[in-house]
Regions:
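Bacterial N-terminal signal peptides that target proteins for export
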Residues: 2-16
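Sec-dependent N-terminal signal peptides
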Residues: 15-23
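Active-site flanking loop/helix segments enriched in acidic
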Residues: 34
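Short N-proximal segments of mature Sec-exported proteins
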Residues: 37-95, 103-107
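Compact alpha-helical subdomains of small soluble proteins
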Residues: 74-177
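N-terminal signal peptide c-region/cleavage motif recognized by signal peptidases
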Residues: 25-27
Length: 178
């Protein structure tokens, strides 16, 4: 009997600790997800990285420079969005995480080019003209997704906020007329 009580107390304590851990992890999980504006920023950065690798590998400096000039503001805003994501999710290690991601992104595009071999330039150089045809950051992000531009980011999207529930009428209060 005494043994059963001790076992129940231990089990109850473990359940309490598990519940507290889950409560504490909730905000951390929410912090590590990707906001919609951050998703756009990461997509734009992936396209920029793909075009940068293509410019270097395929001697398309003029096209890349035209892309950077046209979208200078959007590219800078996207970089700031990525910085903000890593500040939010990595705290004091944000700069190291940001640098690591940008390096990983460039390496992924470079490896993609190596795998494509002699087909890389013919397949990639049309992207310059198509990217330059976009008019804003949303167009660039959509273009990136439509073209399946490689992005090694695995962070899940944040869940959408639930819509607010309508207020309940107080007892004795009649519903509003429609």
């Amino acid at each position: 009997m005494r043994h059963d009580r001790a076992l129940r107390r231990k089990t109850g304590f473990r359940l309490l600790l598990g519940g507290l851990a889950a409560l504490m992890a909730g905000p951390a999980i929410a912090q590590s997800c990707l906001q919609p504006a951050e998703r756009t920023a990461f997509d734009v950065r992936a396209l920029q990285s793909k075009l940068m690798v293509a410019a270097l590998a395929c001697s398309r400096d003029a096209e890349y420079n035209a892309f950077v000039r046209k979208f200078q503001g959007e590219l800078a805003a996207s970089y700031r969005g990525i910085q903000g994501h890593f500040r939010r999710t990595a705290g004091n290690a944000h700069q190291r995480e940001l640098d690591g991601f940008i390096t990983q992104l460039a390496n992924a595009h470079s490896q993609d080019g190596i795998r494509a071999g002699s087909q890389f330039c013919p397949l990639t150089t049309p992207l310059f003209e198509l990217a330059l045809a976009q008019t804003n950051v949303e167009g660039l992000a959509q273009f990136t997704q439509e073209r399946n531009v490689l992005n090694p980011l695995t962070t899940p999207a944040c869940p959408a906020a639930a819509p607010a529930a309508p207020a309940r009428p107080r007892p004795g209060q009649r519903p509003a007329a429609r």
